[in-house]
């Protein structure tokens, strides 16, 4: 009798076109929306499933009464018509395609994905699989243009998606990071764009599925909480055993010594000196290093003891420039590392620390620059079971929005990713050859001489790259070759092509505020102004900012300016564009909140 009833419900549902209301859900085309029967604290009120294809199901969840209208910046329009079956069994809504099943509990909202042999591919945790917290953008993060931000855009939701994961599962993806980690199972990673960091909200599993979440916010993989200062995670003791802080010893290149207490190691950023908002709201960073101490050529040691509140493998994050070594409990846990002072890096490591034991710690730092950076923080301890879950956190979004992509193998999963994000153009064959690039070539003569030398030496080069600063010193953003160094760009391009080479050029979304292109973009409201207000000058000594690449009109104007000055002007002789500085980065090594402003 139950089987007959289920088949009858399925048949009725399959006959539906749009707008059908069933007992627990509403169906409109390929969308099925469920108003949850049990609203949990911090949980969603509605969940919407979209069958994109046989192997792709989209999951949206909101804590609001309805879903907001939004246009994705990463998902291309999906016009495929997937065939699928919908049925209800008790509290469960079941969607079956030709490749998989998705089962959602209409009471709790928990979703489980299966293959057609009833093997679990992925399932959300039963309680807390989808959680929300209201989020309002702090005024200082909206910066000088706060008056232009509509009230509705100041408010959204922080959300976390949490899934069970078996011990033998591995995760790969998240973009390109300097973490020296491949399998991200049990690891933490902050997702944002930076000079040496490319973040992609997508992972694949060795269980042959992938998850792509549609969020452009600051995100965290793994631990959803920020790392703690050492004094928030441990009891600290100085090198003599006195409780409260570590001992910091600073010795400059002349042997002059400063010894002081350190309750945290957090010298990770610098503040723009003329920034009113920085001076009012942030007194941290490298300004808390000893006043008047010359870092370059110095040696710094932080030492003492930490006492942990519980036994755990503690996950640390080291932020460093210059030379760095760390010992914990007498063991070298971070062998010597180096990073150029103007562009620090993060390095993650974990080590066991016993509860209630004064464990020695020693941090050795050689700053190797007039300005340099150092920080050591630690994640609050979590159980191994918690670490091994698949956890995604997004700081601010209108809703939770992710795509589950199934496949028989990882190639099929990547194919699903390409279905969602659009097919990548196939590069011409010459791009598969060797590319030659320097920090920059400084003249057309450099370009032509180097290309000829490669040919004379029979070294196969297909592409030579012109990096930054081919413009006049004070004209960043002009997209114009400086005539004194590039007297005839057309002849340079023709020469490279005559040697059967190709030419690639770096173009930046950055403009000095004195150039014509800046003024044209600014007249339409398409330039960011915080760096201008704060009078930030780059390392060459000039003031500038970045344009608003989120505006369709701004992007069209940006391309027109490139086209007029570099492409059409030189008979389409430029073969490839290096769209540099996708961060954007108005100044190196500022705190996260200021980068947002």
Question: Which residue stretches match the model-derived regions?
Answer:
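Bacterial N-terminal signal peptides that target proteins for export
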Residues: 1-8
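Boundary at the C-terminal end of the N-terminal hydrophobic targeting segment
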Residues: 20-24
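A low-complexity, Ser/Thr/Gly/Pro-enriched, surface-exposed linker/loop concept
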Residues: 25, 29, 48-93, 133
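Extracellular and analogous surface-interaction loops
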Residues: 51, 204, 293-296, 301-314, ...
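Aromatic- and carboxylate-enriched substrate-binding clefts and catalytic-loop regions
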Residues: 64, 347-349, 366-371, 460-597
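Solvent-exposed beta-strand/loop surfaces of large extracellular or lumenal domains
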Residues: 69-85, 288, 328-349, 529-534
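Catalytic and substrate-binding clefts that recognize carbohydrates or anionic sugar/phosphate headgroups
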Residues: 88-241, 255, 314-318, 323, ...
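Extended carbohydrate-recognition surfaces in non-catalytic/accessory domains of CAZymes
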Residues: 231-310, 399-426
């Amino acid at each position: 009798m139950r089987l007959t009833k289920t088949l009858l419900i399925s048949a009725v549902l399959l006959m539906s076109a749009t707008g059908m209301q069933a007992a627990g859900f509403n169906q409109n085309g390929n969308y099925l929306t469920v108003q949850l029967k049990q609203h949990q604290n911090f949980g969603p009120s509605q969940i919407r499933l979209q069958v994109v294809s046989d192997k792709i199901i989209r999951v949206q969840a909101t804590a609001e009464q309805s879903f907001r209208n939004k246009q994705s910046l990463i998902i291309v329009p999906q016009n495929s018509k997937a065939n699928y079956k919908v049925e209800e069994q008790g509290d469960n809504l079941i969607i079956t395609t030709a490749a998989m099943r998705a089962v959602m509990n209409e009471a709790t909202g928990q979703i489980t994905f299966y293959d057609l042999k009833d093997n679990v591919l992925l399932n959300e945790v039963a309680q807390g699989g989808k959680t929300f917290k209201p989020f309002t953008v702090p005024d200082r993060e909206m910066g000088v243009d706060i008056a232009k931000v509509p009230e509705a855009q100041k408010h959204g939701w922080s959300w976390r998606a949490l899934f069970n994961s078996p011990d033998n599962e591995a995760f790969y993806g998240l973009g390109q990071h300097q973490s020296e980690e491949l399998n991200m199972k049990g690891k933490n990673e902050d997702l944002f764009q930076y000079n040496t960091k490319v973040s992609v909200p997508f992972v694949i599993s060795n269980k042959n599925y992938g998850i792509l979440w549609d969020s452009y916010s600051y995100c965290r993989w793994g631990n959803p909480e920020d790392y703690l200062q050492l004094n928030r995670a441990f009891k600290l003791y100085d090198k003599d055993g006195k409780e409260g802080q570590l001992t910091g010893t600073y010795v400059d290149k002349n042997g002059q010594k400063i010894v002081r207490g350190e309750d945290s190691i957090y010298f990770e950023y610098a503040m723009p000196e003329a920034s009113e908002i920085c001076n009012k709201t942030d007194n941290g960073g490298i300004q808390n290093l000893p006043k008047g101490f010359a870092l370059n050529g110095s040696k710094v040691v932080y030492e003492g003891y930490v006492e942990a509140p519980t036994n755990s493998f503690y996950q640390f994050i080291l932020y460093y420039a210059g030379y760095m070594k760390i010992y914990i409990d007498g063991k070298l846990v971070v062998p010597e590392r180096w990073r150029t002072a103007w562009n620090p890096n993060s390095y993650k490591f974990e080590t066991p620390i016993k509860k209630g034991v004064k464990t020695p710690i020693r941090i050795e730092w050689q700053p190797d620059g007039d300005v340099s950076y150092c920080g050591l923080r630690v994640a609050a301890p979590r159980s191994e079971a918690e670490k091994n879950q698949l956890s995604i956190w997004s700081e601010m979004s209108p809703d939770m929005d992710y795509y589950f992509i199934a496949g028989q193998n990882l190639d099929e999963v990547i194919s699903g990713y390409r279905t969602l994000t659009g097919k990548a153009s196939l590069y011409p064959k010459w791009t598969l050859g060797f590319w030659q690039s320097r920090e920059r070539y400084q003249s057309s003569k450099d370009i032509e001489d180097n290309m000829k030398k490669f040919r004379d030496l029979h070294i196969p080069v297909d592409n030579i790259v012109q990096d930054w600063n081919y413009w006049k010193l004070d004209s960043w953003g002009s997209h114009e070759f400086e005539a004194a160094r590039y007297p005839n760009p057309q002849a340079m391009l023709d020469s490279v092509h005559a040697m059967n080479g190709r030419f690639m050029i770096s173009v930046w979304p950055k403009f000095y505020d004195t150039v014509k292109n800046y003024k044209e973009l600014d007249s339409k409201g398409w330039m960011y102004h915080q760096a201008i207000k704060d009078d930030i000058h780059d390392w060459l000594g000039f003031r500038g900012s970045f344009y608003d690449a989120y505006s369709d009109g701004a992007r069209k104007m940006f391309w027109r300016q490139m086209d007029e000055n570099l492409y059409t002007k030189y008979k389409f002789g430029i073969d490839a564009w290096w769209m540099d500085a996708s961060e954007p980065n108005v100044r190196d090594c500022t705190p996260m909140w200021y980068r947002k402003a």
